[in-house]
Amino acid sequence: MSDKLSYKVADISLADWGRKAIEIAENEMPGLMKMREMHSESKPLKGARIAGCLHMTLQTAVLIETLTALGAEVQWSSCNIFSTQDHAAAAIAKTGVPVYAWKGETDEEYIWCIEQTIYFKDGKPLNMILDDGGDLTNLVHSKYPQLLKGIKGISEETTTGVHNLYKMKSSGTLQVPAINVNDSVTKSKFDNLYGCRESLIDGIKRATDVMIAGKVAVVAGYGDVGKGCAQALRAFGARVIITEIDPINALQAAMEGYEVTTMDEASKEGNIFVTTTGCADIVEGRHFENMKDDSIVCNIGHFDIELDVKWLNENAVKKVNIKPQVDRYLLKNGRHIILLAEGRLVNLGCAMGHPSFVMSNSFTNQVMAQIELWTNTDKYPVGVYFLPKKLDEAVAAAHLDKLGVKLTKLTDKQAKYLGLDKEGPFKPDHYRY
């Protein structure tokens, strides 16, 4: 392992710029700061060697430094070839944390970066995984199965990665206990909804400068991400059409006043298309052929499988790169398609991703999950678990002061009437916020 690079980033000279930006992000991430305040002396993650595969952004930098403050050794790669913020990566690498990430990796470089995080500098392998999308989890299970027995747990950040964990569990291939961070209420109902509500528009605007008011926007999927995207597009004056497979989500969309139809129909009407489903083959060749001239097409689901970019590359008459992560395709019918971020995450490929405050919710859950799996290993046989409701409420509580929120306290009489502890949890596990 002696020939291993101590880090690989785009430009280490960006570290000072990154450090200034990280300091600002810290002030917007009260949950992570609370974790440092509570645990930096006891260091509950001492001995943990955490391999992380998650967008290497300023917010992730605050997460990494929280994990190290709590005693962990950490190595990091990004979970998307376009999502790294190079100044953030440089700032973390300069502190001595091995980071292997830069914006604009090839697919081969992407896998190489992940592999660099498997073994630490002393030759010892990872014993914890912090994942976003499942690529690190899948790589270790398929290529490094001899290491699985030494791994105490996996914490998974996003919907796509959680789907992957449940598929592995049902097929019997999952060999490590995992916590589903995505479905913590303070993750899915905040990051997925409010984060996308702001960062989608940021990505589209930075990439295209398009006027959204008056346009027809098509949002594929009406889960938490789709809800946030639809709200944002409507707020900017677009007429929004939803596509859905689930009758419950479709009914929700209709009751909010959105038109709900199929992509075959919507592709003829839209000017802006956003996929949010986490599923494959949402926009296919026939849909591109239906679209109006210069329709803008983008994806905010984790992988680039939602849009048939391969069809565009094979069937377009011409492809012109307008600027980084913005490509204009000329189709045989004479119309153009503007594709953002090559069909990958538009909010991170074309903008800066979610704001720090909402990511503090998600990443505080990640820290709690890592502590839980590392310190209470015996409680977690192989399977997929949720964080307890009490911890979910604690994440929310850590963010209230920053917003000037004053919480009402139950009286003894009220608590007795409701059958609750005055300090919570306040809702049953099955409650749908």
Swiss-Prot record:
This is Adenosylhomocysteinase A. The gene is ahcy-a. It is an enzyme of class 3 (hydrolase). InterPro entries: Adenosylhomocyst_ase-like_sf, Adenosylhomocysteinase-like, Ado_hCys_hydrolase_NAD-bd, NAD(P)-bd_dom_sf, S-Ado-L-homoCys_hydrolase_CS. GO terms for molecular function: adenosylhomocysteinase activity; NAD binding. Homotetramer. Catalyzes the hydrolysis of S-adenosyl-L-homocysteine to form adenosine and homocysteine. Binds copper ions. GO terms for cellular component: cytosol. Disulfide bonds: none annotated. It catalyses: S-adenosyl-L-homocysteine + H2O = L-homocysteine + adenosine. Residues 184-351 are annotated as: NAD binding. Substrate binds at residues 57, 132, 157, 187, 191. Binds 1 NAD(+) per subunit. Pathway: Amino-acid biosynthesis; L-homocysteine biosynthesis; L-homocysteine from S-adenosyl-L-homocysteine: step 1/1.
